[in-house]
Regions:
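Nucleotide-activated donor-binding/catalytic signature segment of Leloir-type glycosyltransferases, i.e.
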Residues: 292-325
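Conserved acidic donor-binding segment of nucleotide-sugar-dependent glycosyltransferases
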Residues: 377-378, 382-389, 398-403
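Aromatic "clamp/platform" in nucleotide-sugar-dependent glycosyltransferases that forms part
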Residues: 345
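Carbohydrate-associated surface elements
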Residues: 204, 224
Length: 440
């Protein structure tokens, strides 16, 4: 099967733009082969939707995959591996600005962060971006069995591809119609109806679509991880030294990009109420906020607020901001953790819950997160009331005060995580792809 993927965030991020790469190497053939570059010039995605899709490609028997993603000033085409080619879409500054405002408006409404007053020019930029993606995807029409489009940034792509080819869409963020304005809710629903099949990550999202009057085919699948990809565990002592983690520290780990939606502030307020515990916040900015991405300062502003909060609560010596960590360092942090948190008020799923379980760690998860559907209180972890740092602190104490039960919960969690292993979910996804191929 030949699959063409579309997502905003690419599977690879460069530390130099295309002109910088040309200046460094002189001549680069297009497509640019990653194996010909120094490893310091790029990094493969270590989180989110791109990481999930990379693991899917590794574990599936796809004959060939083409992936279209946003890549400002990136090389036009990059060869990641023999069966994976990435094609980058670039936009002018004005279009990027309008696009960011519109898609962040959707994001904020979906997560209950803020209402968005739609501005026609911002929508136009969003539509242009989706059109450019669809144009690139349609170049592969005769050599594609199914298009696989991912997330809210690409809502219009299915309607543009239209009846020319089968298109499957996975919507990864929350869909709670009651917290969205009618215009945004209806825009999302009508856009989804242009796809042959829509996949959502949780039962709650599927129920939300039904309440909103969605007329189409929708399926629920839990996002997936490859447990083998989490087997890279770096030098634990080196990681402890790097992040000033002592042998007697109880490590409370929260893995996620620096984003107000992740509510790291709730974790900081909770840790102030838990003695002899060190909160490790692992992650940097999203593609939108990172250098080499869209370079907004959302992550930087949030970091400064979090650091100020830690100082005000006198816990700055017990809160560690790691910034970007490699897969090996992340594995070491999971190994060191006594408990892993997911604190978002609202989140589509939260794969870090399953990652923690792969390492047989107990979790404490906000009830507003999709992965809370898999948490059985007192059995594989605990849930807490969103934004209630007192409740979170009590649940963390329950884990730390009963080490034998914590070990048992981690073991049960590992069994739960098998429901989200790529080997099982990829079979379901392949069946969906095959079901829409009639259009070819």
């Amino acid at each position: 099967m030949k699959v063409s993927i579309n997502s905003q965030t690419p599977p690879v991020k460069f530390s130099l733009d295309y002109s910088g790469l040309l200046e460094k190497y002189g001549v680069l053939e297009v497509p640019v082969d990653l194996s010909s570059l120094d490893k310091t010039d790029f990094q493969l995605s270590v989180g989110g939707v791109p990481r999930m899709l990379l693991q899917l490609i590794d574990k599936s028997d796809f004959e060939f995959v083409r992936w279209v993603a946003l890549g400002p000033k990136y090389p036009p085409i990059v060869k990641v591996k023999d069966n994976l080619m990435v094609y980058f879409v670039s936009l002018d500054i004005a279009t990027i600005s309008g696009y960011i405002k519109f898609k962040e408006g959707i994001y904020n409404e979906a997560h209950g962060l803020a209402k968005y007053n739609i501005k026609p020019r911002e929508y136009l930029s969003y539509a242009y971006y989706n059109w450019y993606c669809a144009q690139r995807l349609l170049r592969f029409l005769d050599d594609t069995d199914v298009y696989f489009v991912n997330d809210f940034q690409q809502l219009l792509v299915g309607g543009i591809i239209g009846p020319s080819a089968p298109v499957v869409f996975w919507y990864h963020i929350p869909f709670i119609p009651e917290i969205m304005s009618p215009r945004i809710r209806d825009f999302i629903v009508k856009s989804m109806e242009a796809y042959d099949v829509v996949i959502v990550s949780t039962k709650a999202c599927l129920e939300g679509l039904i309440r909103a009057g969605f007329r189409g085919i929708a399926k629920q699948m839990y996002p997936f991880i490859d447990p083998e990809a989490l087997s890279k565990v770096g030098d634990v002592q080196a990681v402890k030294d790097k992040f000033n983690i002592r042998d007697d520290d109880n490590v409370v780990l929260l893995v996620g990009r620096l984003d107000p939606m992740k509510r790291q502030d709730v974790a900081i307020r909770a840790i102030a109420k838990v003695d002899n515990a060190k909160l490790v916040l692992a992650g940097n900015g999203s593609f939108t906020s990172s250098r080499g991405g869209l370079a907004t300062d959302k992550a930087g502003m949030w970091y400064r607020k979090l650091a100020k909060l830690a100082r005000e609560l006198n816990v700055e010596d017990r809160v560690v901001f790691t910034g970007y960590v490699s897969e090996e360092e992340l594995g070491a942090l999971y190994s060191l953790a006594n408990v892993v948190l997911l604190t978002s008020s609202v989140e589509g799923f939260g794969l870090t819950t399953c990652e923690a379980w792969v390492f047989k760690k107990p979790v404490v998860v906000s009830k507003g997160c999709g992965s809370a559907e898999l948490v059985i209180d007192g059995t594989n972890g605990y849930t807490f009331v969103p934004n209630d740092y007192d409740d979170l602190a009590e649940k963390v104490k329950m884990v730390l005060n009963d080490s034998e039960k914590a070990i048992w919960m981690g073991e049960v969690g590992f069994e739960t995580a098998k429901r989200c292993f790529v080997d099982s979910v990829s079979k379901e996804l392949k069946a969906v792809f095959e079901s829409v191929q009639y259009k070819k």
